[in-house]
Amino acid sequence: MDRTAKADLVSTLNGVFNESAVVVVAHYKGLTVADMQKLRAQMKQAGATVKVAKNSLAGIALDGTDVASIKPLLKGPTLLAYSGDPVAAAKVAVDFAKANDKLVILGGAMGKTALNPDGVKALASLPSLDELRAKIVGLVQAPATKIAQVVNAPASKLARVFGAYAKKDEAA
């Protein structure tokens, strides 16, 4: 790799580290090419990316970024998994590591917060942004649905509801 290619890689990685919500570092020694392709496909499906880069170049790219705390983890055959979703890369990496013991999670960073392997596993157990958005939409729609059900209910059901409230007030 010539000097300009190295400079381009460092620049690209620096941009990735600045834009990513989470970066996970893992050892991949012993993974087959098929395993790496499977990991890359799973990451891509989740909206995350896996990159294998020379540790010294990745270390240079980390300088001045929020995730610079992962620099000491860059020893040996390491891969970097990153995503804009704070949970996606961690979730895929942890799930893949459970199925394949050759992938060893070393740690990671979420913004300026350094994560140890247990922190990455805890992050992976959280719901993704899409899941949280779906829950919020469901919670917002629930009251509207209930109002629509009451408005559309037959008059007899409404009479029973009002009668029940009247009996409740008399009993109290």
Curated annotation (Swiss-Prot):
One of its GO terms (cellular component) is large ribosomal subunit. GO terms for molecular function: large ribosomal subunit rRNA binding; structural constituent of ribosome. The keyword Amino-acid biosynthesis does not apply. GO terms for biological process: translation. Keywords: Ribonucleoprotein, Ribosomal protein, RNA-binding, rRNA-binding. It comes from the Bacteria. PROSITE patterns: RIBOSOMAL_L10. SUPFAM superfamilies: Ribosomal protein L10-like. Part of the ribosomal stalk of the 50S ribosomal subunit. The N-terminus interacts with L11 and the large rRNA to form the base of the stalk. The C-terminus forms an elongated spine to which L12 dimers bind in a sequential fashion forming a multimeric L10(L12)X complex. Forms part of the ribosomal stalk, playing a central role in the interaction of the ribosome with GTP-bound translation factors. Belongs to the universal ribosomal protein uL10 family. This is Large ribosomal subunit protein uL10.
